[in-house]
Amino acid sequence: MLSAGDGALQLAEGCVRLNAMDREYEMNDGTEKPSFVEISGNPMPKNLVGGYLTTSDNKRLRYAVCNVAGSRERGTVVLLQGRNEAIEKYFETIANLNARGFGVVTFDWRGQGGSERLLRESRLGHIKHFGQYLIDLECVMQEVALPDCHPPYHVLAHSMGGLIALHASSRLTNTVERMVLLAPLIGFASGVPSLAMLGRLSNAARWLGFGARPVRRSTSNRIADPASNLLTSDRERYARNRRLAETAPELFLGSPTVAWLAAMIRAMRRLDDSDEIAALSVPTLIVTAGGDQVVSTGTAERLAYRMRCGSSLTIPMARHEMLQEADRFREQVLEVFDAYAGDTSVLAAE
């Protein structure tokens, strides 16, 4: 099985774009025209366009680009989602970044959102190995971000997206200026068995043929009270995201599979290796949530300390999904990103 760091996964040349970057395009190959779901309180950002890509291993990804109108912009944010998310969940964030002068490119990871599912049971979150996510990111960078979006490029990643960004860091050195990782999935919060134990159990189950089985029964509808959920303290954004999931359930997932869990644990454990940490070469700010009960804040802070180009800060009392949090937390995150990205205004191409 390929690991996240294997050179065999460096395959940018294999991506094929399926459509033009224009709202007026017509698909000539019979491919479904990409669409986005709008609900009350979650409008699609102005200037957002979308399309599909096919990766080198023949998986279809849905992507979106939202460049800044006008003659000047501050570069492009490559926005990386967490597990069980979709482009629509970030409409508000895309609009906020546009208002600050940044263009945005984002996409749905394989197996979730509007991208191709990997199992017949489409509600299960599944990958065979972590390197598949690196294929997705490389494809979008080479086929959308670099040719169609303005430099400089910055990564803004949440949770699982942060873990992927870290493993892609050595490949992004010559293209990405800086990365801001929000509550990255580097370790699980307290109360979860150790990564070593989970790794042994998940690997054993996978080798016994249970890789495509769910880790647990779906609990997507169990938490109904915004005050008690682990993701956000903001009632309005919580309700908006629930409405989105109810309106477009095909975009979202239930349980991850055993193979997904095994791949994540292997990727997290690699980041405890000194050689892996030494290869993290893009300047990176890790932002942790003070009230996070999903991922380990301490593990993320220790990684930042060990990185030669890393730093960290904490948003006190914020829950795991900081871009879905109350304004008093969310605005801090946006200000931090803005300051870390710096004054990188460039003239946009005419």
Question: Model-predicted segments: where are they?
Answer:
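Short beta-strand/loop motif that positions the catalytic acidic residue
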Residues: 280, 286-288
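Catalytic active-site module of serine/aspartate enzymes centered on a nucleophile-bearing elbow/loop
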Residues: 316-350
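Alpha/beta-hydrolase-fold enzymes
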Residues: 160, 165-252
